[in-house]
């Protein structure tokens, strides 16, 4: 019996030794091989970019282009994770998320920034810009600089301005040709007192609601209509639940790409260089592509929907401007006479 137990013990010891030697040969004496993806993940930095619109919009496409350029310029060492359609934060939540460090990049509509600094409301004034050249001149010049400077007190850093386009009006309550046609209508608008006051001036009842709730509000007849760019009307299919579209171009819709100042300063000079270069190239692309996209998608709406479309003539736009001019006087004490003057000068030049 003892000899049997001894034999068993020797066998177990032999097996254990063989296993150890085999394991050692495969791991201890050889370097573990990583594929390219695994190697990249060992030192990859990941930043989050949250926005609330669809990917097939000027902002959605710009965010993805920025991510691609950062990946390319960093050799895969910096990854921008893009969260579209409000999948991470709503347009009401994203600024706080940025300040809390839960996300590193956002691109809220400029209308949202009035809650941080009232001067941002100047971009919501009716017919603030009358064409894309005026937008570029204003935001790439003194007006854009002043607005980004106003964010510093909130420890936020403005990186770029991205354009969506000019806002149009959709409704189920008959064609909108004159300012009086909006009287008595309930309209969904962005969070902006300036926008609210201009629609009240025309006799409408504006409702400040989140962007991603708009389709449901229209579908359930909670509101009669809304204002938005062609790109947003197309991507969110508002034309399926609205009967009339007026090409009024009465307001500008754009975005301020932002990050947190503390986050930015914590990055290495090389990381900041890569992010800055990628943002510059993306912004130049957006300035050209946004205008083209809105034109193309208007043609798609014309071809593929039953919505009735009316385009204001230049003479009719002048009538709308005249009716809405009191909003400029109302907000001059808040925005400052100089900022208003610069905006009106751009209107003259365009």
From Swiss-Prot:
Which of UniProt's keywords are assigned here? Secreted, Signal, Sugar transport, Transport
Where is this gene product found?
A: Secreted
Chief place of localization: secreted
Q: Which GO terms describe its biological process?
A: transmembrane transport
Q: Where is the signal peptide?
A: 1-18
In terms of superkingdom, the source organism counts as: Bacteria
Matching CDD domains, A to Z?
PBP2_TRAP_SBP_like_1 (cd13674)
Q: Name one Pfam family in it.
A: DctP
Cite the InterPro entries for this sequence: DctP_fam, TRAP_DctP, TRAP_DctP_sf
In terms of Gene3D superfamilies, this protein maps to: Bacterial extracellular solute-binding protein, family 7 (3.40.190.170)
Q: Which GO terms describe its cellular component?
A: extracellular region; outer membrane-bounded periplasmic space
- Tell me which family the UniProt entry assigns to this protein: Belongs to the bacterial solute-binding protein 7 family.
State its role: Part of the binding-protein-dependent transport system for uptake of C4-dicarboxylates. Responsible for growth on fumarate and succinate but not malate. Is not directly involved in C4-dicarboxylate uptake, but plays a sensory role in the DctS/DctR two-component system which regulates the expression of the dctA C4-dicarboxylate transporter.
Q: Spell out the NCBIfam families in the cross-references.
A: dctP, TRAP_S1
Tell me the PANTHER family matching this sequence: C4-DICARBOXYLATE-BINDING PROTEIN DCTB, PTHR33376
- Which named protein is this? C4-dicarboxylate-binding protein DctB
Which species is the source of this protein? Answer: Bacillus subtilis (strain 168)
